[in-house]
């Protein structure tokens, strides 16, 4: 994902090495893979969607596993992308889509998200609900890895999707999709990616983790500076983690962001890596996550007290990173999901 930029920047800027950290970056195929590798001890930490904190700690849709999240990498960064076929059928917004759905009752329109415990799922549902569409009964929402979204849209397997960049811009570049909305239009400044850490690692290597947070704070500030964005897009394209070109990667980093149907927008707040105190796992972020899970029936009301307590434990760890100058080693990989 484009918003893995702080990890790439930290490596390219030599921040891991200069802070005495030995960090290995690995790219995984999907969020389910990251979850499984965390549970089975194959990962110490990961660049992950915020909702995985709650899913892992409560054992939702899988075994429970204690994790903490001392750092937020980014806010926003996603978009809704629909097929060109829907555009050709007159769809311009969710209200128009509702009319089309009503006129074709023999067809079940299908939309993709990267995880049910992610902002993408919440954003997709909010956009549908804006047009009076019931996400549970009027359409089908399926989970796919982000890197397959544009491809599945082009092959007609999806009518639309919500994903992070560069997959929306890739669909636009392929002339198979267009974007009616971005994160900021639906849920402004929502937490997107977090540093997800196994609790046992956090307890055993607290100083190393505090140093790592300090490194990421510096790399996030670098990524948020407008003058660094072109270089950042180049680094991402050269990293070997992306099939997308530097041109496609730059659309949400440098801009302008092209919606695929002749409308462009500035990208100043498309990705927020450091501004607005983005890196602090604040109480309002946890509250938002709980509210979304309750609204979308991912969390039974009976589990709400436990969920509040688990999030409080997970999001209050190491919120004041400091630099530790002694040499430290992180033996297992920091993982990003492409």
Feature map (PLM): residue ranges:
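Short glycine- and hydrophobic/aromatic-rich loop-to-beta-strand nucleating segment
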Residues: 80-81, 194-197, 201-202
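C-terminal non-catalytic accessory extensions
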Residues: 314-338
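Short gly/pro-enriched beta-turn/loop segments at secondary-structure junctions
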Residues: 189-190, 231
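Functional cores that coordinate and move charged inorganic groups
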Residues: 146-147
